[in-house]
Each structure stands twice: as C-alpha cells, then as structure tokens.
A protein has these predicted regions:
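Hydrophobic alpha-helical transmembrane segments
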Residues: 24-26, 90-94, 177-182, 203
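Aromatic-anchored segments of alpha-helical transmembrane domains
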Residues: 30-37, 100-105, 183-193
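N-terminal transmembrane-helix/juxtamembrane module of multi-pass inner/ER membrane proteins
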Residues: 1-74, 108-143, 236, 240-241
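Transmembrane alpha-helical segments of multi-pass membrane transport proteins and ion-pumping complexes
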Residues: 36-37, 100-101, 105, 109, ...
C-alpha cells in the first residue's frame, strides 16, 4: 500500500503549530538579521571563487535528483527484500521531500527574492568586483513576482535537511545514518549557498527543512512501532535493533 500521504494533513498542521512556528519565525528573523547586517553580501563576495564553485557543482545535480532517486531506491530495495521497514522508510523520505518542496515553493512564490548575480560565473566576480552593487536586499513580495525557482528559502537545502532529519528520526541510534544524513544535508546546503543562493536562504532552508523532516520522521516512526508491535506496546530494544 502507498503510504506517501500517511497522516499528511496532521503532519502539515504539526509543521505550522506549537514550537515549530517559533522555529519558522526564527528562520525569518535570522534572514532579516543576515540581510540587513550585510552578511549575505559579505558572504557572497567571499565565497564566489572558482575553487568553491568546482567543489559545489555536483551538489546542484544531487540536490535536484536525489529527492526522487533516493526514496525510489529504498522502495525498490524494500519491495525486493520484502522488508516492511525499508518500504516505510521510502515513503517517509518521499513525504519529507514532497512537503519540503511544496512549502518552499509557496514561500518563493510570495517572497520573490532575486538570486545572487553571476550564477555559474564565479570568475567574473574577480574581474568586475569593484563595480558590483549589493543586490541582497532584492525581495519582490507579492505572488509569482520572482518565480518559484530562485528565492527564499533554498529549495535544495530545505529538501536535503528534511530528508536527512526524517531519516535520522527513523534511525536515530545509528551513528552511520546520523553522520551520513548531516553530511549530505550540509554539503547540499553549503554548496548552493556558494553558487545559486544567498547564505540566508541556506540558513532558513536548514531550519525549515529540519522542522519538516523531524515532524514527518516522528510520524512514520510511530507507524513503524505500531506495525512492529501491534496494540501500541513499546519495546525497549527497538532502538537498539536499528
């Protein structure tokens, strides 16, 4: 059975309620601080060099295709081995990616933030550095005034952190999973912050994505527990068996 939409309405409500609203507010406030203090522009001037761009380039493709390929690979592995846990993990990752993309797209459609200049042309910064004008304040609030590709928060970052934190919530006792998840999320996020996004878009995406991933992860973790132990009985050895 497809569990991609398992408790979806409840999870959406959870993302935008209680403490999670405070985290969302912190993403907004942190963005305002970084932008108004000149942090975005300073970070942009410091990081737009060839070496950073070359290291970050693979993340642009990874961040675009992994949200689809990763859940599919886990799902195929789970179906092939008839492993219910892997199948549930695949649906959890899929929902985390879906919600992160949906929420990010809605935010971008409203905030309409202009992207950093010279996308993919890091070498031009050194040649024209003195003539550059700070464009980090370029928000176009409204609806679809800046499209849904560029903008606040970073979609690559939000989806990466959402999937990573979802996986960590499901396998939180596994040091390998925790390390892999965090490395993946930070690589994607930092990579886009030195190429196609402002630094504040990375920070906001990391916060919002973490909230989404933890919410979805908790939801599917409950599903795993209930299916593993009918009747809702807890098992102290569950985490140890991860």
């Amino acid at each position: 059975m497809c569990d991609l939409f398992y408790q979806l309405p409840r999870n959406v409500l959870a993302i935008f309620s209680g403490r999670n609203l405070l985290w969302y507010a912190s993403a907004v406030i942190l963005t305002i601080i970084i932008v108004t203090s000149g942090g975005d522009w300073a970070y942009y001037r410091w990081t737009r060099v060839g070496a950073f761009f070359e290291l970050a380039r693979p993340a642009l493709a990874l961040g675009m295709f992994m949200p689809v390929l990763w859940p599919l690979a886990v799902l195929v592995a789970g179906l092939a081995s008839k492993n219910r846990r892997l199948i549930t993990t695949a649906w959890a990752l899929g929902q985390a990616a879906f919600l992160a993309y949906l929420i990010t797209t809605c935010n971008k459609a409203i905030t309409g933030r202009r992207p950093p200049p010279f996308h993919g042309h890091a070498g031009m910064l050194g040649q024209n550095g003195p003539a550059l004008v700070d464009s980090s304040h370029g928000f176009q609030f409204g609806f679809l005034r800046g499209g849904i590709f560029w903008g606040w928060p970073s979609g690559h970052t939000t989806v990466a952190f959402s999937m990573a934190l979802c996986l960590i919530m499901l396998y939180r006792r596994s040091k390998v999973v925790v390390l892999f998840g965090l490395l993946y999320a930070f690589y994607i996020g930092l990579a886009v912050s030195v190429t196609i996004h402002w630094f504040s878009e990375f920070t906001a995406g990391a916060i919002i994505g973490s909230v989404i991933g933890m919410t979805v992860g908790r939801s599917f973790r409950t599903k795993l527990l209930s299916s593993r132990f009918p009747g809702g009985k807890a098992c102290k050895n569950f985490d140890e068996q991860q």
